Swiss-Prot record:
Entry protein name: Proteasome subunit alpha
Xref: SUPFAM superfamilies: N-terminal nucleophile aminohydrolases (Ntn hydrolases)
GO molecular function terms attached to this record: threonine-type endopeptidase activity
Pfam families attached to this UniProt entry: Proteasome
GO terms for biological process, alphabetical: modification-dependent protein catabolic process; proteasomal protein catabolic process
Source organism of this protein record: Mycolicibacterium paratuberculosis (strain ATCC BAA-968 / K-10) (Mycobacterium paratuberculosis)
Length: 256
């Protein structure tokens, strides 16, 4: 006599968690950190068309690690939610915490009710409206719908432990854009060296970089273009130190 296959709820949740964690770890790493001018996003991403960093709304940005098709669906859903709410009420009613909560509820439902969990980890960041002095906010949302606010930085995807360790050792509050970019890239290179033994493999062509600029009047999100990033990394590679220079001028050095 054969018995029906049975798996305990605890075992099912463990297997779902393991599947999601392995999928996220296979992806490339992403760093989001607070700096003096807002929030900086730096992602390992050799693709120019499949972007891991995005604007969600006027003062809110998004970054993700894991399976592209899954987090891109979430990204587009977040944009639609924000646009609808901003149109129906007021643009200031759209906040990073609100969007992070929506993502947490969505991922939690998928994790418990669907056949397969999403293999994604998300970061939602928000900067203050122009003229306000509220500090930036970072929210990490994991595959099971867990949400946490992070005061300084978020690391997702790939080999996170060496990147997190490097950031704990080198992160500086109120760093300017130049210093923050160097801190983030050095941390990502530490992760690259840990996984494949080669820091030099992480060059400007394999990086996607953007910022939420608190000093912009309306839309804070800006992408850092390749020439500006090449200049920053050239100085980093040649000097081997963070240096004390001011942040580079972004006029003509970024794009929407």
């Amino acid at each position: 006599m054969s018995f029906p296959y049975f798996i305990s709820p605890e075992q099912a949740m463990r297997e779902r968690s393991e599947l999601a964690r392995k999928g996220i770890a296979r992806g490339k790493s992403v760093v989001a950190l607070v700096y003096a001018g807002g929030v900086l996003f730096v992602a390992e991403n050799p693709s120019r068309s499949l972007q891991k960093i995005s604007e969600l709304y006027d003062r809110v940005g998004f970054a993700a690690a894991g399976k592209f098709n899954e987090f891109d669906n979430l990204r587009r859903g977040g944009i639609q939610f924000a646009d609808t709410r901003g149109y129906a009420y007021d643009r200031r009613d759209v906040t990073g915490r609100q969007l992070a909560n929506v993502y947490a509820q969505t991922l939690g439902t998928i994790f418990t009710e669907q056949a397969k969990p999403y293999e994604v980890e998300l970061c939602v960041a928000e900067v203050a409206h122009y003229g306000e002095t509220k500090p930036p906010e970072l929210y990490r949302i994991t595959y099971d719908g867990s949400i946490a606010d992070e005061p300084h930085f978020v690391v997702m995807g790939g080999t996170t432990e060496p990147i997190t360790t490097a950031l704990k050792d080198s992160y500086a509050e109120n760093a300017n854009l130049r210093e923050a970019t160097r801190i983030a890239v050095r941390a990502l290179r530490a992760g690259s060296e840990s996984s494949n033994g080669d820091q030099s493999a992480l060059d400007v062509g394999s990086l996607e970089v953007a910022i939420l600029d608190v000093n912009r009047p309306r839309r804070a999100f800006r992408r850092i273009n390749r020439p500006t990033l090449e200049n920053l990394l050239r100085e980093l590679d040649s000097n081997g130190s963070d240096g004390n220079g001011d942040a580079p001028e972004l006029n003509g050095g970024s794009s929407d």
